[in-house]
UniProtKB/Swiss-Prot annotation:
Phylogenetic classification of the source organism: Bacteria, Pseudomonadati, Pseudomonadota, Gammaproteobacteria, Enterobacterales
Domain of life: Bacteria
PANTHER family: PHOSPHOGLYCERATE KINASE, PHOSPHOGLYCERATE KINASE 1, CHLOROPLASTIC-RELATED
Catalytic activity: (2R)-3-phosphoglycerate + ATP = (2R)-3-phospho-glyceroyl phosphate + ADP
InterPro entries noted in UniProt: Phosphoglycerate_kinase, Phosphoglycerate_kinase_CS, Phosphoglycerate_kinase_N, Phosphoglycerate_kinase_sf
Protein name: Phosphoglycerate kinase
Source organism of this protein record: Enterobacter sp. (strain 638)
Similarity remark: Belongs to the phosphoglycerate kinase family.
GO MF term set: ADP binding; ATP binding; phosphoglycerate kinase activity
Subunit structure, interactors included: Monomer.
């Protein structure tokens, strides 16, 4: 990969625009999992140390584009950064027509998704972003797979576009793991975003020796075996695709699950066979037998790719499946790479971050890179390096 790296540049006195991935979970105005901010801090600190005029921004959540919404403000991130940095930190809400930044100061530009045209990679918006800086630093691996104004468009028009240390490190680590992985290689795909990930399984089946599914994806496979999944999250229109995958790949489908009659933190968990799910019930976690079966598979792995929890681990009663799988990964001798927001939150919750070989800040980007797809932001950086 041939890109300009931020670490090769002299940033003293330069206006530096860092696109980080600060899309973290927030509850009651407080950051509940800081993994992505922690990962971005060294880049921010390096730019400040060099005497740059530093701006950093990110998306957070899914607000209606073009509208300010306090619920999705980066204010909780700013408060977190104020605690961690000795430099002054301030949040700027309106910045598209210019912003003054002092050397040694960190200015956080409000949620990029409040700007109309962000997601469509609007050229006029991209040029406004580019006009704010001398150097654009793309450091958000988590959004490198999206061609958007703050991740891709700005880079085409900024004087200099480079890869931040975190992005460069991510690409190197993932590249090494995928080039010649130690075998057997096990890929775990879980979480709630079903349709985006079911298509990924096809590609992964060609790379990995064993696929494991969890969460909403697993429910689609349970349905594909002819079981009633009640009110569970699953994709009815992808059941045929799941059936096809079951004939071509060895995918362990849950045989026992934890169900509830409501989706809430206080819902009662009932352990039962997948043969006995009622219409009013929904699957929220794996059962102990199914989770242990996955743990046994992971024990023998030499490379593990982990993207997504296997149950609604945010609810204490539906945490056990993900905990069993997480601990099996932590106890394994395999080279393990974990990615995705929910996965990072699970790693934090179970306190196993020091037992995972590499933690990627990317979710969708992580999966697309694993699939061998071109990431638009990376392609843009490679193009800019030629000029």
């Amino acid at each position: 990969m041939s890109v300009i790296k931020m670490t090769d540049l002299d940033l003293a006195g330069k206006r530096v625009f860092i696109r980080a991935d600060l899309n973290v979970p927030v509850k009651d105005g407080k950051v509940t999992s800081d993994a992505r901010i922690r990962a971005s801090l060294p880049t921010i600190e390096l730019a400040l140390k060099q005497g740059a005029k530093v701006m950093v921004t990110s998306h957070l959540g899914r607000p209606t584009e073009g509208e300010y919404n306090e619920e999705f403000s980066l204010l909780p991130v700013v408060n977190y950064l104020k605690d961690k940095l000795s430099n002054p930190v301030r949040l700027v809400k309106d910045y598209l027509d210019g912003v003054e930044v002092a050397e040694g100061e960190l200015v956080v530009l409000e949620n990029v998704r409040f700007n109309k045209g962000e997601k469509k990679d609007d050229e006029a918006l991209s040029k406004k972003y580019a006009a704010l800086c001398d150097v654009f630093v793309m450091d958000a691996f988590g959004t490198a797979h999206r061609a958007q104004a703050s991740t891709h468009g700005i880079g085409k028009f900024a004087d200099v576009a480079c890869a931040g240390p975190l992005l460069a490190e991510e690409l190197d680590a993932l590249g090494k793991a995928l080039k010649e992985p130690a075998r057997p290689m096990v890929a775990i795909v879980g979480g709630s975003k079903v349709s985006t990930k079911l298509t990924v399984l096809d590609s992964l089946s060609k790379i990995a020796d064993q696929l494991i599914v969890g969460g909403g994806i697993a429910n689609t496979f349970v349905a594909a075996q002819g079981h009633n999944v009640g009110k569970s999250l699953y994709e009815a229109d992808l059941v045929e695709e799941a059936k096809r995958l079951l004939t071509t790949c060895d995918i362990p489908v849950p045989t026992d699950v934890r169900v509830a009659t409501e989706f809430s933190e206080t819902a009662t968990a009932t352990l039962k066979s997948v043969n006995d799910i009622k219409d009013e019930e929904q699957i929220l976690d794996l059962g102990d037998v199914s989770a242990q079966k996955l743990a046994d598979i992971l024990k023998n792995a030499k490379t593990i790719l982990w993207n997504g929890p296997v149950g609604v681990f945010e609810f204490p009663n539906f945490r056990k499946g993900t905990e069993i799988v997480a601990n099996a990964i932590a106890d394994s001798d395999a080279f393990s790479i974990a990615g995705g927001g929910d996965t990072l939150a699970a790693i934090d919750l179970f306190g196993i971050s020091d037992k995972i070989s590499y933690i990627s800040t990317g979710g969708g980007a992580f999966l697309e890179f694993v699939e061998g797809k071109v990431l638009p932001a990376v392609a843009m950086l490679e193009e800019r390096a030629k000029k």
